């Protein structure tokens, strides 16, 4: 592993431990050339995913880009970073276990919205507004109507 401070390849792992859900290994490292300490994270990657954008361009799947877009949707919302990380891991697992190495950005968006809907309604609407490219207030009304009908259905099930 290359040192982020001096670019030396002479580094050593000082401590390794799994995260709470055991999906990632956290490693503390030290550079033997400059004594700089840094942390790396290691996770299993089942397959290389390629995203097919709306314009037809193909780009490698970027987990960090997904995290950033969700952080924007969740800005100022009462959601713990751990819950966000769990959701992102679940989305990535679903994508990787889907059997396809290429997946459309639309399919990724739908999967993300499915998970986000369970996490936070406001973030769901924010994400939907960008993903579905809302142009008018009625676009928001439609999504809010979906959420309202889901809430009514859940309440009816609880009464039974």
Curated annotation (Swiss-Prot):
Residues 1-11 have a biased composition (Polar residues). Binds 1 zinc ion. GO terms for biological process: negative regulation of DNA-templated transcription. One of its GO terms (molecular function) is zinc ion binding. Its cofactor is Zn(2+). A zinc finger (unnamed) spans 3-34. Keywords: ATP-binding, DNA-binding, Metal-binding, Nucleotide-binding, Repressor, Transcription, Transcription regulation, Zinc, Zinc-finger. Residues 1-20 are annotated as: Disordered. Residues 49-139 form the ATP-cone domain. InterPro entries: ATP-cone_dom (IPR005144), NrdR-like_N (IPR055173), RNR_NrdR-like (IPR003796). Belongs to the NrdR family. PANTHER family: TRANSCRIPTIONAL REPRESSOR NRDR. Negatively regulates transcription of bacterial ribonucleotide reductase nrd genes and operons by binding to NrdR-boxes. This is Transcriptional repressor NrdR. It comes from Rhodopseudomonas palustris (strain BisA53).
């Amino acid at each position: 592993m290359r040192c982020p401070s001096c670019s030396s390849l002479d580094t050593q792992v000082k401590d390794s431990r799994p995260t709470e859900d055991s999906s990632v290994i956290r490693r503390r490292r030290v550079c033997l050339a400059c004594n700089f300490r840094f942390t790396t994270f290691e996770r299993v990657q089942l397959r290389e995913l390629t995203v097919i954008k709306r314009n037809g361009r193909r780009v490698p799947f970027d987990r960090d880009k997904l995290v950033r877009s969700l952080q924007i949707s969740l800005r100022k919302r009462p959601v713990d970073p751990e819950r966000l990380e769990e959701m992102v891991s679940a989305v990535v697992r679903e994508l990787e276990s889907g059997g396809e190495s290429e997946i459309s950005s639309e399919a990724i968006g739908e999967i993300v919205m499915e998970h986000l809907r369970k996490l936070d309604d406001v973030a769901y609407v924010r994400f939907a507004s960008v993903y579905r490219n809302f142009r008018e207030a009625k676009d928001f009304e439609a999504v809010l109507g979906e959420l309202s009908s889901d809430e009514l259905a859940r309440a009816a099930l609880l009464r039974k």
